[in-house]
Amino acid sequence: VIGGDECNINESPFLAFLYSQLLSSRRYFCGMTLINQEWVLTAAHCNLYPDRKDMNWWLLIKLGKHSGSTRRWVANYDEQVRYWPKEKFIWWYCPNKKKDVINNYVWVWWDKDILLWELWMLIRLNRPVKYSEHIAPLSLPSSPPSAKWWHVGSVCRIMGWGQITETWWNSEDTLPDVPRCANINLFNYEVCRAYNQRWWRGLPAKTLCAGDLEGIIRGGWDTCVGDSGGPLICDGQYQGIAYWGSKPCAEPDEPAAYSKVFDHLDWSQSVIAGGTWWRGDDTCP
């Protein structure tokens, strides 16, 4: 998190992180949110080794941890580790009706304003976690976030163990010892399109747009590399999943994008309940 402060040790008992034993110094690479004893929610692009099940045993999900760096490793008494999931479900592409190419990336469209791509991933842990002082779920939202045209909407909280300097994936020295937290503001989707039409025209209208009001002009608080998959908490509710931002981070005129949790509640609840679920190779909802 760029421009943030150290999170209070009791602020984020729902925050987990994905850790790989094969990435050398880059061992931590994505945030996650615990939503009940068996399930965590993260960004779909955190699905490392998607076609190599034999590699999954090198991936760990750590919960209840506050000090996450190898330089200052201070364990909480109630930390828990889970190996790669029992199941994972990705909210994926729709069969394409139209393709558009932006900066050599193929965007697949379902209708005139909804772009469906890999946005988020539900992971079922290999065994349930036990709730404790530093491990507790973050409830799914009961209402959508608010944002007004050209005005500051909800005040939202971001957090994670991602980079604390603006450079794009630097050394481990730019990763914090403990998670960083910052307050940012939610903006109307059209406001973000006005600031950065190159990228925001390719993102679905249901995407949440958030950043620092002054930073929109001169750069400021922002998520960065390693914060992907972490939560966006607005008015105390879990409203977004970090999945896209500027490179370098915290650039002027480039607010970050978050997948909107509220708009996918039915899908998430269906998956957790063991019901039907949708992938890109099935009929679109």
From Swiss-Prot:
EC number: 3.4.21.-
InterPro entries found in the cross-reference section: Peptidase_S1_PA, Peptidase_S1_PA_chymotrypsin, Peptidase_S1A, Trypsin_dom, TRYPSIN_HIS, TRYPSIN_SER
GO-annotated cellular components: extracellular region; secretory granule
UniProt domain Peptidase S1: residue ranges: 1-273
Reported pH dependence: Optimum pH is 8.0.
GO MF annotation list: serine-type endopeptidase activity; toxin activity
Temperature behavior of the protein's activity: Optimum temperature is 38-40 degrees Celsius.
Signal peptide from the UniProt entry: none
Tissue spec: Expressed by the venom gland.
PROSITE patterns noted in UniProt: TRYPSIN_DOM, TRYPSIN_HIS, TRYPSIN_SER
Cysteine disulfide partners in this protein: 7-181, 30-46, 94-284, 156-234, 192-209, 224-249
Gene3D superfamilies reported in the protein's UniProt record: Trypsin-like serine proteases (2.40.10.10)
PTM notes: Homologous thrombin-like enzymes are N-glycosylated. This enzyme does not contain the consensus glycosylation sites, suggesting it is not glycosylated.
One GO-annotated biological process of the protein: proteolysis
Keyword Transmembrane set for record: no
Subcellular location, record wording: Secreted
Annotated control of activity: Inhibited by PMSF, disodium-EDTA, S(Dm) and soybean trypsin inhibitor (SBTI). SBTI and S(Dm) (the anti-hemorrhagic protein) acts as a non-competitive inhibitors that decrease the enzymatic activity.
Catalytic residues of the enzyme: 45, 113, 228
Assigned keywords, A-Z: Blood coagulation cascade activating toxin, Disulfide bond, Hemostasis impairing toxin, Hydrolase, Platelet aggregation activating toxin, Protease, Secreted, Serine protease, Toxin
Remaining remarks: Negative results: has no activity on the gamma-chain of fibrinogen (FGG). In vivo, does not induce a significant edema activity in mice.
Family that this chain belongs to: Belongs to the peptidase S1 family. Snake venom subfamily.
Subunit: Monomer.
Function field: Thrombin-like enzyme that induces the formation of fibrin clot. Cleaves the Aalpha-chain of fibrinogen (FGA) with higher activity than the Bbeta-chain (FGB). Induces platelet aggregation in both platelet-rich plasma and in washed platelet preparations. This aggregation is strongly inhibited by preincubation of the enzyme with PMSF.
Protein name as it appears in the record: Thrombin-like enzyme TLBm
